[in-house]
Each structure stands twice: as C-alpha cells, then as structure tokens.
Amino acid sequence: MILLDGKKTAQDIKNEITAEVNKMKANGEKVPHLAALIVGSDGASLTYVGSKVKACELVGFESTLVKMPSTTSETELLKKIKELNQNDDIDGFIVQLPLPEQIDTQKVLMTIDPSKDVDGFHPENFGKMALDMTTFIPATPFGILELLERYGVETKGKHTVVIGRSHIVGRPMSILMGRKGFPGNSTVTLTHSYTKNIAQITTQADIIISALGVPNYLKAEMVKDGAVIIDVGITRVPDETNEKGYVITGDVDFENVSKKASHITPVPGGVGPMTIAMLLKNTLLAREQRKVNN
C-alpha cells in the first residue's frame, strides 16, 4: 500500500511556488496578492482562513484578511466583493463558505470577478472547466488531480466512483476524471444520497473519491483489492481522550480499508493540505494572467 502523502506533496508545491515568487522579486515584479473574506466568527472557518493567510506569507505572497460580522447584510457583502473586484492590487480572492442564512451564496459567487475567482466556483469558470478550457479549477479537486499525477496513479480506462455531488468537490471531480488527458480518461460513476446499493458500485471501482462528510462511511467490504482511495471527508468527532476534545476523521475506515487499497490518502495529512497548496497555485496563475492582460 502506498500512502498518498498530501502534506509532503503540498510542501513540494509550496517550495515550487516560493521559487517562482523569488524570481518575481528578483525581477522587480509585483508578487501575488490573495484576499480572504469571512463573514461571522465560526471557529472552524476562522482557523481555515487563518491557515490560508499563513500559507500566503510562507510562500512570499501578500495577503489580506477581511472580516465582517455575522449580521452583515447581503447588500453589504456584495458591495465589499465589488470593491475587491475593482482593487487592482488584489490578484485573487476567496469568500469563505458557509455564509450566514440571510445571504444568498449563489448570488455572492456570481458577483466575484471570474478572473479573480481563485476558488473556481463562478459559473463561468465551472463551465470552462466542464469544456476543458483553461481556467481556475476548484482547489480540492485540483489537489486530488495533482496527487494522482505526482504519484503516477493510472486513471486511463479505470472506473472511478465519486461519492458526493457537491459543487465544491464531487461534481467537479466527476467532470475532471472523465476529461481527456492525465489524470482523466476514466469512466465515472457519480453517487449520492439517493444512490441505491452503493456498495455494489464501489466494489467495482478502481478509484474511489469519497466526499460525503460521514465519518468512517467507506468500509473494507465496500472496496475491492488494489483500489485507489481518496478520502476528502473531514469531520470533527468528539473524543474526550484527545486534548482538543475531538479527532479529525475522514469518510474512510482507514485502518481496515488501507489493508486492501493500493494507494490511499490519510486524514489528516491527505487532501486537506493539497487544497491550500492549490489555492496558492491558482493565485499565482491569476497574477500571471493579470500580468499578461495588463
């Protein structure tokens, strides 16, 4: 069994990005600038945004964190997004999800300038991705592709089963694995909460990408020998024996599934670090595109 080490791979990518930024500095060029916008004070979201800002600093990017209270109206948020759209100093920005219930998430995503949408959630970018055009790929699917590529996992002609159909992971992943090229050229089955007899489908899979958010959902009996397992799930499970009071648990019963898998991602240390690394890569791409366009 080969462990798909997202932590190490993400660090390799960050080192490559740092080298690019150092070249920019040496040439007197502007370095990439990522802004992160968060509404409210959700602990997990604040931690995640904080890690993105810290990652920017470590690779030499400029970063801006915009915090808005949970009582922020949709009108106020859209105004702030338009300000970020028009700020030439900022190359890309993200709006941390989920948003408070008074705000229409779809309207927010539609308002982001597609050329600054480094999360890849704008319908224009999503459509370009579906048509195999150059665009920003959502960071988590982008990270999974990068892991598969760097570890040389064969995808051509393989049966890939994606569990979960969110627009953040499941749906883009199903599109990307079916596209021409590597990683891709896979036959894809997209499953979800209404899929019947899911174990019959997963046991036929060469590659399983689980993005369900249900701890230890994927059991060993649902997996065939030699399958490649990508675990996108990150759930805080209460654990009184842990000093934090919880443990981070994936969708996959790692202990038992890893005995059958040919390749598997751990949780934590698998897909999570890759997501942040690819957000940085998208921001670097945004800076390069803006340089060309200007």
UniProtKB/Swiss-Prot annotation:
One of its GO terms (cellular component) is cytosol. Keywords: Amino-acid biosynthesis, Histidine biosynthesis, Hydrolase, Methionine biosynthesis, Multifunctional enzyme, NADP, One-carbon metabolism, Oxidoreductase, Purine biosynthesis. Transmembrane segments: none annotated. NADP(+) binds at residues 164-166, 193, 234. Pathway: One-carbon metabolism; tetrahydrofolate interconversion. It catalyses: (6R)-5,10-methylene-5,6,7,8-tetrahydrofolate + NADP(+) = (6R)-5,10-methenyltetrahydrofolate + NADPH; (6R)-5,10-methenyltetrahydrofolate + H2O = (6R)-10-formyltetrahydrofolate + H(+). GO terms for molecular function: methenyltetrahydrofolate cyclohydrolase activity; methylenetetrahydrofolate dehydrogenase (NADP+) activity. It holds the Pfam family THF_DHG_CYH. Signal peptide: none annotated. InterPro entries: Aminoacid_DH-like_N_sf, NAD(P)-bd_dom_sf, THF_DH/CycHdrlase, THF_DH/CycHdrlase_cat_dom, THF_DH/CycHdrlase_CS, THF_DH/CycHdrlase_NAD-bd_dom. PROSITE patterns: THF_DHG_CYH_1, THF_DHG_CYH_2. Homodimer. Catalyzes the oxidation of 5,10-methylenetetrahydrofolate to 5,10-methenyltetrahydrofolate and then the hydrolysis of 5,10-methenyltetrahydrofolate to 10-formyltetrahydrofolate. Belongs to the tetrahydrofolate dehydrogenase/cyclohydrolase family. This is Bifunctional protein FolD. It comes from Flavobacterium psychrophilum (strain ATCC 49511 / DSM 21280 / CIP 103535 / JIP02/86). The gene is folD.
